[in-house]
């Protein structure tokens, strides 16, 4: 059964794919980008960085995704098949003889994480993963979601404190 996070990630990836259809370098983007889903249903790019991990770890990124129920990171790279044991092996995907160029959207909301992979050699096909991904990118997305939740909670606590202080000053 498809989760709500998967549905949102698929919709987000389709919107981002539509935006990138006419890009000359749609499979070799110079920067990873952070996108948010607005209340109007639009995907809006809020930040970019040449290094996807630095983008995900930046405090500015936390602030840029606060207040939005869904955010997604877009990046490009190489994918390679996993072995029969489900392992990637020691060879980096970029060096694998069966490597494929991909554009990856990893989205997150309060219910989970989902990713959508689009392959350059078959751009009309996608592979959707409902939070089963593992590795440093998946860990970084989960970390960003946690930091976002903590920052939003801190903002709410500050607002409550200000309201309570306002009541005692009256």
Question: What does each model-found stretch correspond to?
Answer:
Residues 40-42, 79, 111-112:
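Short loop/turn segments at secondary-structure transitions that flank enzyme active sites
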Residues 30-34, 68-70, 92, 99-104:
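Short, surface-exposed beta-edge/turn micro-motifs
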Residues 94-170:
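Glycine-rich, aromatic-bearing surface loops/beta-hairpins
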Residues 1-64:
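N-terminal domain-onset segments
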Residues 45-69, 125-143:
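A signal for specific C-terminal beta-sheet/loop modules enriched in small/flexible residues
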Residues 56-96:
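Short HxH-centered metal-ligating active-site micro-motif
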Residues 28-38, 70-77, 169-170:
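Short glycine-rich, low-complexity/disordered patches
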């Amino acid at each position: 059964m498809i989760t709500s996070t998967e549905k949102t990630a698929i919709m987000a990836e389709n919107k981002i794919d539509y935006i990138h259809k006419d890009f000359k370098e749609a499979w070799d983007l110079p920067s990873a980008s952070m996108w948010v889903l607005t209340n109007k249903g639009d995907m809006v790019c809020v930040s970019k960085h040449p290094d996807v991990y630095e983008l995900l770890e930046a405090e500015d990124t936390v602030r840029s995704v606060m207040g939005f129920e869904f955010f997604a990171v877009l990046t490009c790279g190489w994918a390679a098949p996993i072995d029969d044991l489900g392992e990637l092996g020691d060879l980096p995907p970029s060096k694998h003889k069966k490597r494929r160029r991909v554009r990856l959207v990893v989205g997150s909301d309060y219910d989970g994480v989902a990713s959508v992979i689009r392959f350059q050699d078959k751009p009309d096909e996608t592979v959707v993963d409902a939070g089963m991904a593992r590795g440093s990118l998946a860990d970084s997305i989960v970390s960003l979601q946690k930091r976002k939740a903590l920052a939003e909670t801190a903002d709410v606590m500050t607002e409550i404190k200000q309201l309570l202080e306002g009541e005692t000053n009256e």
